[in-house]
Design a protein with these regions (language model features):
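Short hydrophobic alpha-helices and adjacent helix-cap/hinge residues
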Residues: 1-287
Length: 287
């Protein structure tokens, strides 16, 4: 990671704080709310990178600003209540760790700035108006790799030449999952393969979903890029190994947890990346 180049995703929230605010008493310090669909344990590395980026800007937690954290532990249905808690705290900005958290935050408030390091299809999903000018109160970064689904299919075929059946571990309650699944299914057909899906929407679903794919005798499994599946990367790697299912991922973090191979982005880098357009969220560009 090019740490010197990366500082914060806050889209100007920190940079725009007046100088006087930096020296105010603790009760007046700017408040950042971290909202995640994952677990605190899995998020620790991302939090560390964010705080390191803030330190590069000269902001230190507990001195110049305060943080509150809310984690859904992989249960997306907990996010609305957690978001309501966050909004009642009246933070200066909500840092939504993934698009599912950004959706929950957007439903809860139209005034508090919301920044996310992992937006996906945000325009098509109606979260922002455009990448150049998001509009509303949401901005962030879209860590999308052009041609990612095609590359995942390519890797699947390299792992097992002649692959005929590709399993998809999906998470349909995450807004960005269905478009991924549809694209992968279409691409599988173009190479003469069949795609079989098994849905996991809470951590307890993962073992059963992988068992279902094993029962379908899939040759390889592609794990979709969602918050819950990412935070469950260790469980997925363990279960896939036990069922002898080769797996392809879109996030490097899956491989660090024991997965086979990934092609995609390093989310920890994106979490502390500099956002070049640092005005208010309605004007800030997504990058």
């Amino acid at each position: 990671m090019r740490r010197r180049e990366v500082i914060t995703l806050l889209g100007g929230a920190a940079a725009a704080w007046p100088l006087g605010a930096r020296a105010e008493v603790a009760s007046k310090r700017p408040l950042i709310a971290w909202l995640s669909g994952g677990t605190a344990q899995f998020s620790a590395g991302f939090v560390d990178n964010f705080l390191r980026g803030m330190r590069d800007l000269g902001y230190i937690e507990g001195r110049n600003f305060d943080m509150v954290y809310r984690f859904a532990d992989g249960y997306g249905d907990r996010l609305p209540a957690l978001t309501d808690e966050v909004v009642r705290l009246k933070p200066d900005v909500i840092l939504a760790s993934a698009i599912i958290a950004a959706f929950a935050a957007r439903k809860a408030t139209s005034t508090i700035p919301i920044v996310s390091p992992a937006l996906a299809d945000a325009v098509h999903l109606g979260l922002i108006a455009s990448e150049a000018r998001p509009g509303g109160n949401v901005t962030g970064i879209e860590p999308y790799v052009e041609g990612l689904p095609a590359k995942q299919i390519e890797f699947a075929r390299e792992i097992l030449p002649g692959v005929r059946t590709i399993g998809l571990l999906t998470n349909s309650t995450d807004p960005k999952a269905p478009p991924q699944a549809q694209e992968l299914e279409s691409l599988a057909r173009t190479v003469g393969a069949k795609a079989v899906s098994a849905d996991a929407n809470v951590p307890e679903d993962i073992n059963g979903a992988l068992q279902a794919l094993a029962g379908e005798r899939v040759d390889v499994v592609i794990v979709l890029q969602t918050s819950m599946l990412l935070s469950s990367s260790q469980n997925i790697a363990t279960a896939a190994l036990a069922k002898r299912l080769p797996t392809v991922y879109g996030y490097r973090e899956h491989v660090l947890a024991g997965g086979l191979i990934s092609y995609g982005v390093d989310l920890r880098w994106f979490l502390s990346r500099r956002l070049l357009c640092r005005q208010n969220p309605a004007r800030s560009c997504t990058g």
